[in-house]
UniProtKB/Swiss-Prot annotation:
Encoding gene per record: rpsB
Entry's family note: Belongs to the universal ribosomal protein uS2 family.
Keywords linked to the UniProt accession: Ribonucleoprotein, Ribosomal protein
NCBIfam families named among the record's database cross-references: rpsB_bact (TIGR01011)
Pfam families listed in its UniProt record: Ribosomal_S2
InterPro entries: Ribosomal_uS2, Ribosomal_uS2_bac/mit/plastid, Ribosomal_uS2_CS, Ribosomal_uS2_flav_dom_sf
Protein name from the UniProt record: Small ribosomal subunit protein uS2
One GO BP annotation of this record: translation
Amino acid sequence: MAQVSMRDMLQAGVHFGHQTRYWNPKMKPFIYGPRNGVHIINLEKTVPMFNGALAELTRIASNNGKILFVGTKRAATEAVQAAALDCQQYYVNHRWLGGMLTNWKTVRQSIKRLKDLETQSQDGTFDKLTKKEALVRTREMEKLELSLGGIKDMAGLPDAIFVIGADYEHIAIKEANNLGIPVFAVVDTNSNPDGIDFVIPGNDDATRAIQLYVTAAAAAVKEGRSQQTATEEKFAEEVAAE
């Protein structure tokens, strides 16, 4: 079972919040107190909340659910992409385009355009174009890849989103709320925990802390996927035995 310990969190700096003057009073239940002008997050709250979130991610993945990892702030981009790919899930790590979930029909058309351009770049179509036109299409493809590359194979809305930085990704959270998609989010002391189904109180800026969250989430998803595979294999064996 994917779990994270208090020691893991301390070493990653999960407990360091923001300067006290930037706090959001709604985070008071999760704050231990101030130290040198910085709020310290109460890890005795965070540890069980995070491990509960991981257990739910495992359950969703075991039912063939799709998880969308979201982290577009600079400190999160690489870790979010690597974790999503590691557990064969989906990600947005560049910029959240308004309507990415709530206007999925339009997003799907953009994904189709991206896939068409990818095909053209590989089947020799680009070679038949003028240099200028080939360059225009290449740039369009690169731009679409940056925004949609992590969701181009998602084939429909996700069953949950795992967010690094509730404050930074408030648009993604609002869209998920509108559609009833469960939200798992790391919430720092300056953020609003409202609208988040699984709150993970913690530092959302430190690279090591972000690495800890997404690595654990990916492990939880992989565990769920392996449970699903085992269940399917057992069912196949039972059918064959009848």
